[in-house]
Amino acid sequence: MANKKIRIRLKAYEHRTLDTAAEKIVETATRTGATVAGPVPLPTERSLYTIIRATHKYKDSREQFEMRTHKRLIDIVNPTQKTVDALMKLDLPSGVNVKIKL
């Protein structure tokens, strides 16, 4: 292939789902003969939301909700056409956001 590296960035709210998706990608790429670097765990993005429990008053009574976004990075070095075809046909778990950069 003309490009020597494929960079795959994965995002998910559940780290177990993310790790299984990364494991499937790494196993598929190594099976087709490409060199794999990763998965590299990137920093977890944490969003915290604070709301008032009551509808009208009692401002001191609040509730906090947290949302964590886990991220992984996988580099596939020297991919073959067979590697690209296998990655296109790969079925990943739902809830995993995949960004591919060539």
Swiss-Prot record:
The keyword Metal-binding does not apply. GO terms for molecular function: structural constituent of ribosome; tRNA binding. Pfam families: Ribosomal_S10. SUPFAM superfamilies: Ribosomal protein S10 (SSF54999). Part of the 30S ribosomal subunit. Involved in the binding of tRNA to the ribosomes. This is Small ribosomal subunit protein uS10. It comes from Streptococcus equi subsp. zooepidemicus (strain MGCS10565). The lineage of its organism: Bacteria, Bacillati, Bacillota, Bacilli, Lactobacillales. The gene is rpsJ.
